[in-house]
């Protein structure tokens, strides 16, 4: 099961639907409705911290969950605000960048982590005004925009990954494949029909398939910082 922390953002539900389309079981909880300890006790195989319209310091359990996943060695994906929370936890600076709401950018990457098997560059949709700078050595930058803005990183030794852009946006290329690679990192195997459909943009070591749920209606929400 993937536990998704919803930072009160409508994009959360796009992520949920993508994960379910890939065969994952998903539980969603608001950022002020659970503690990090409760999250770890939920039985989740992996965690996802969603986008949101605030800073990491205002994002409820998000920073505490990053710390808990680090201590427990649990797989974690942070998207936009979640990416910033991971960066801040490890000592990166979260600061103002250019306003990138609804803009697409080419993303260049090193073919590791979430980007295994994907072409470089690919187009990604960005909804943010904050970025992570001064990324510490514990985080390996593995994706950048053409102006060298950090678009993604992975922890050097832990299964922790962050993306500044939105893989769940319809205008982002290979979004399902990136999330499939995260599920593979978390040990969740895709059904063979999905693995074949994703083709080259899928990591080779996907783990065991999980059941799907009917789509969930999105709550009112904002856009990522």
Go through the PLM ranges and name each one:
Residues 19-20, 69:
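Hydrophobic alpha-helical packing residues
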Residues 1, 75-77, 93, 140, ...:
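Proline-centered loop/turn at the N-terminus of a beta-strand
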């Amino acid at each position: 099961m993937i536990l998704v922390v919803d930072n009160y953002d409508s994009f959360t539900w796009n992520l949920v639907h993508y994960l379910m389309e890939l065969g994952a079981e998903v539980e969603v909880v608001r950022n002020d409705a659970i503690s990090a300890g409760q999250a770890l006790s939920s039985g989740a195989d992996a965690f996802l911290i969603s986008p949101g319209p605030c800073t990491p310091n205002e994002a409820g359990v998000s920073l505490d969950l990053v710390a808990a996943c680090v201590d427990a060695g649990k797989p974690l994906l942070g998207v936009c605000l979640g990416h910033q929370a991971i960066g801040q936890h490890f000592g990166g600076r979260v600061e103002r960048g250019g306003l990138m709401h609804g803009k697409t950018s080419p993303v260049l990457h090193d073919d590791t982590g979430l980007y295994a098997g994907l072409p470089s560059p690919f187009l990604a949709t960005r909804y943010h005004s904050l970025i992570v700078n001064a990324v510490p050595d514990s985080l390996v930058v593995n994706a950048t925009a053409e102006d060298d803005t950090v678009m993604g990183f992975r922890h050097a030794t832990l299964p922790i990954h962050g993306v500044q852009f939105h893989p769940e946006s319809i205008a982002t290329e290979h979004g399902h494949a990136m999330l499939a690679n995260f599920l593979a990192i978390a040990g969740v195997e895709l059904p063979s029909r999905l693995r074949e459909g994703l083709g080259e943009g899928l990591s080779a070591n996907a783990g065991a398939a999980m059941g799907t749920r009917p789509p969930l209606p999105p709550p009112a929400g904002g856009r990522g910082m």
